[in-house]
Amino acid sequence: MSQIKENPALVAAQEAQRKINEALDAGYSFRLEAGAGAGKTYSLVAALKKLIDERGSMLVRTGKKVACITYTEVARNEIAQEIEDHPAILVDTIHGFCWAFIRQFQKAIRDLVSEIDDKKEKIELGGGIGSQLVEYDLGFFSVDEKRITLNHDDIPELMAMLLAKEKFQMLFSEQFPVIFIDEYQDTNRKFMDAITEFFLKPKTGHIIGLF
């Protein structure tokens, strides 16, 4: 009588999930290495559901969230649907996530924009930086007397620049004790370098999950 062999992909997925659960229980950061079609999204959703079950009420009560940063809108929508848009989880694309955070700090953004070398000519032509409103809606960089508009690539770069400052590291930490990054290998390099340098390497107490 022949034995039924277990599906190797299923066995690997179960083992990966076990390791993720162990890391979450211990409060450790982790990285899931798996190729396309290896069930990374399933593992990410399962990890989010575990956090919702175990910490969801506490996170909502204290005004904190698990950040789940996706590479595409499609992934964002899929994950948000799977967790039923639970209020303890913020699921967004990297640009949506970064803009939601940095837009709170208008003066800091204006100061940082003025430090970016390839912006200086346009800033000068636009009359300089004063107290304009900084916006991200047109998709290109411009400056006039009333507003500064940011382009697509500015958003993660400015987020990385902001996170280099201790004040904003603390504010970020207060809001997001757990950060999951989907398709981290394709995620903006400056943003990933900032997360690694200021939250992963120093062992800040954050749980960083890289999928």
Where is each model-derived feature located?
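Conserved protein kinase catalytic core
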Residues: 99, 188-189
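Conserved RecA-like helicase ATPase core segment
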Residues: 50, 196-211
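Short helix-terminating capping/connector loops at secondary-structure junctions
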Residues: 58-64, 173-174, 203-207
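P-loop NTPase Walker
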Residues: 1-107
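Structural motif corresponding to the C-terminal cap of alpha-helices
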Residues: 52-56, 162-167, 199
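Accessory N-terminal region flanking or inserted into the helicase ATPase core
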Residues: 1-38, 43, 106-183, 189-194, ...
